[in-house]
């Protein structure tokens, strides 16, 4: 994930805005609805293929303070089933618009205004609960 964030190509190339077509995404562009019409601020985020390709719900997410150079909201979304090797392979992580990930899992919408430095895990009850969070270290 850190490698993707540090890649000027990903952000500068505006990958966060368009949907790459090389992966078999669960949802196609015409299926996406506008779920965040009043969102203000940067709307880029990271999500794994567990969510966008396999269709698993978000199980864990966190918001870190972005460097401000790109339209990054700071949100990172995972199913919670990924291991370190999976997440560290940038081919399994993509840069997306927050609205896109909300289409995959609308349950995250109430979390999006949380401050930087927060994390949430989905409990056995199916609801998100705040978790302690330590920002990942740089490259």
Where are these regions (language model features)?
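Acidic, proline/glycine-rich low-complexity IDRs
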Residues: 1-54, 58, 62-139
